Design a protein with these regions (language model features):
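Short amphipathic helix-loop junctions that connect adjacent transmembrane helices
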Residues: 1, 212-219
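Central cavity-lining transmembrane alpha-helices of secondary-active solute carriers
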Residues: 1-17, 38, 103-106
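Glycine-rich segments within core transmembrane alpha-helices of 12-TM secondary carriers
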Residues: 7, 64-68, 91-120
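Cytoplasmic membrane-interface "Motif A"-like loop-to-helix N-cap segments
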Residues: 19-34
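Hydrophobic core of transmembrane alpha-helices in multi-pass small-molecule transporters
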Residues: 33-39, 45-46, 50-70, 202
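Cytoplasmic helix-loop-helix junction between adjacent transmembrane helices
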Residues: 59, 63-97
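C-terminal membrane-cytosol helix-exit motif in multi-pass small-molecule transporters
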Residues: 105-118, 147-166
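Juxtamembrane intracellular "pre-TM" segments in multi-pass secondary transporters
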Residues: 161-198
Length: 219
């Protein structure tokens, strides 16, 4: 998990700068969304006894990196989705619907799929679709369920968002790094921004820790 976090931490600023320079961000969102889906689906092959824990960690890492990097490019689209006064509302609505969707999906998997020690779900049902409780197939199905949930509820986004602005003149990897360096240098005069970035880093690390280990403690 630490390695994955470092990969995202070091690549995110560079990729973010590139996202601001290149025109069509959707192709990158498709790519990183595919990584998320592959990682989630792959977790199905994690064995209940943990004997192939390496596979589980790699699957998690692929999905996590895909999700975080796709998030960067979707953020870069915000200025083109409305005028400046609407940006906060659009961003907040996206976060809100995302958390509601996460809560609804959690209720679904706990009540219909994830088996308890007695082989029943939280409300006393057998895992649906004939999933084998003894093989923990209900719990293992959570990964594919997440992938399917993401695919289904991403369809409106991919259909409605038409992100094809013209790239900046001379937009390139080099110009992205140049913009990144200018931003870093400018932080010397933006102490409040630095404090926000540092606090946000700890906040996001805490959330990632909860996401990663919450299931272990709950089990």
């Amino acid at each position: 998990i630490t390695i994955v976090g470092l990969i995202v931490g070091f690549t995110a600023p560079i990729i973010g700068a590139i996202a601001d320079n290149y025109g069509n961000r959707m192709k990158w969102i498709y790519l990183f969304s595919a990584l998320l889906i592959i990682g989630a689906f792959s977790s199905w092959f994690g064995l209940p006894d943990g004997s192939n824990w390496q596979w589980i960690l790699v699957s998690f890492g692929i999905g996590f990196v895909g999700a975080e990097l796709a998030y960067i490019f979707s953020n870069a689209q915000l200025p083109s989705l409305g005028n400046r006064s609407e940006t906060g509302a659009i961003s907040g609505s996206g976060f809100g619907f995302g958390y509601v969707g996460g809560l609804v999906s959690l209720v679904i998997v706990l009540t219909l799929f994830v088996e308890q020690e007695n082989g029943k779900t939280l409300i006393g049902f057998d895992p649906i679709f004939g999933l084998n409780a003894e093989a923990k197939e209900g719990t293992r199905f959570v990964g594919p369920f997440v992938a399917l949930w993401f695919i289904i509820f991403s369809i409106p986004y991919f259909l409605w968002i038409n992100d094809k602005p013209k790239p900046r003149i001379g937009a390139s990897f080099g110009s992205g790094l140049k913009d990144l360096w200018k931003t870093v240098v400018s932080l010397r005069d933006k102490k409040s921004t630095v404090r926000y970035l540092i606090s946000n880093m700890f906040y996001r690390d805490s959330l990632n820790g909860l996401y990663s280990f919450g299931g272990v403690y709950a089990a």
